[in-house]
Regions:
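Sec-dependent N-terminal signal peptides
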Residues: 4-14
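A beta-rich soluble binding module of mature secreted/lumenal proteins
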Residues: 16-171
Length: 171
């Protein structure tokens, strides 16, 4: 009977497994060029940001090599209440600065993979192997419609379902 219980428990756990893949990152990130403000133009959001408008992620390299991050957005509408979060980024050694651990709450560090970065450091896609969240960000508040479609399709090509994909209005 105990073996049967273990079998059903394992079956239950595997049935609840999160879809996962190995997201490919860019070869290298010049961390100093990556710092600064990024407008979040589209995402598959976490619970905290599901109603975000005017979302901006700002990065500043600390002397110790960690990354001070400020994530600001209006909740619910373009003029909704301002929400601000200050996670801390930690570059994972051996990744050429393309994989970070993003810490909102100690000691948990969420995976943050720079999956796309144009050569001008003006557009980036940050993804996760769990395929649960993704962020399309740019140095400008908008991109032409054809580029938005191109990057949405790129995200889908990484293995993401677009069911919860959402473009973010910027003012």
């Amino acid at each position: 009977m105990t073996v049967l219980k273990h079998f059903f428990f394992i079956l239950l756990l595997t049935g609840c497994a999160v879809k996962s893949t190995q997201i490919k990152t860019v070869d290298e990130v010049d961390i100093n060029r990556f710092m600064g403000d990024w407008y979040v133009l589209a995402h598959i959001p976490s619970y905290v940001e599901k109603n975000a408008f005017n979302a901006v992620e700002s990065y500043k390299l600390n002397e110790d090599g960690s990354i001070a991050t400020t994530f600001t957005f209006n909740e619910g509408s373009l003029d909704g209440p301002v929400k601000t979060y200050h996670p801390k980024g930690f570059i994972i050694p051996g990744t050429n600065n393309a994989v970070w651990g993003m810490q909102f709450v100690w000691p948990i560090k969420a995976q943050y993979k720079i999956a796309y970065l144009d050569t001008d450091y003006k557009i980036t896609i940050v993804a996760r192997d769990k395929l649960d969240y993704v962020w399309l960000m740019a140095r400008t508040k908008t991109l032409p419609h054809d580029q938005m479609i191109k990057f949405r399709d790129m995200i889908k090509g990484m293995g993401y379902s677009l069911d919860n994909y959402r473009e973010i209005e910027q003012e």
